[in-house]
Amino acid sequence: MSGKARLAGVLGWPVSHSRSPRLHGFWLEQMGIDGAYLPLAVAPEHLETVIRALPRMGFAGANVTVPHKEAVMRLVDHLDPLARRIGAVNTLVVRQDGTLEGRNTDAYGFFENLRQGCPLWEPTSGPAAVIGAGGAARAVVAALADAGVPEIRLANRSRERAATLAADLGGPVTVVDWAERAESLEGCALLVNTTTLGMTGQSSLDLDLAALPTTSVVNDIVYVPLVTDLLARATARGNPIVDGLGMLLHQAVPGFEAWFGQRPQVSDQLRAFVLS
């Protein structure tokens, strides 16, 4: 790496678990780019200082992960309309004039993963059921609404939180009582779990799939483990499945292109490398 190397990184607290440095490092090496992508562990009380220093330190930008994705919104000079709508920033880009732009690429990452993982799925093929109403759900619902999904049935343990999401994002969102989540799967062409239930160390998602058509696509945004209990049960009944790793990989593409000037590809080789 030379003195003219372009720099980017990921801001989080903690950040040691992030696969982003491995992911971006793969692309940098593959493309022969003079650059580096660094993990930046930043406590919440130091976030503003670090954000302000990024342009001076020669950074082209950074990814933002938990717990900073909402707090960083008030620290940027320009906010992308989608990031404002979703209510979170996951990508920072230093503009040529040194100002900071906040973007959200999670919706893009989710949708591209779905398209690559199940090319035959069409947004207009029927309703989608979305489980959860956290930050990830906001990106998923925005992506589905923008793609033209006719109805999005949103179920969350806290109905109030689901109702807030629906009001904030608008579009064809129907809030479903948590007790009726299984029944709401009837006629759906897509099921997406946006919660952490099913992740290693967490309990499994309690969801009966009996009402879900066997032709429906089942997507879990969890990727540790790669095949969650939900995906295993869906496979056993014949549903096509899409795992969550691709969302992480695809959401990284726009940021990498903005920082390093080349658009990377999400390949099977990359998937294997990030998982290894």
Swiss-Prot record:
Coiled coil: none annotated. It holds the Pfam family SDH_C. Shikimate binds at S18, R19, S20, T65, N90, D106, Y223. GO terms for molecular function: NADP binding; shikimate 3-dehydrogenase (NADP+) activity. The keyword DNA-binding does not apply. It comes from the Bacteria. Pathway: Metabolic intermediate biosynthesis; chorismate biosynthesis; chorismate from D-erythrose 4-phosphate and phosphoenolpyruvate: step 4/7. One of its GO terms (cellular component) is cytosol. It catalyses: shikimate + NADP(+) = 3-dehydroshikimate + NADPH + H(+). The active site is at K69 (proton acceptor). Its EC number is 1.1.1.25. HAMAP family: Shikimate_DH_AroE. Involved in the biosynthesis of the chorismate, which leads to the biosynthesis of aromatic amino acids. Catalyzes the reversible NADPH linked reduction of 3-dehydroshikimate (DHSA) to yield shikimate (SA). This is Shikimate dehydrogenase (NADP(+)).
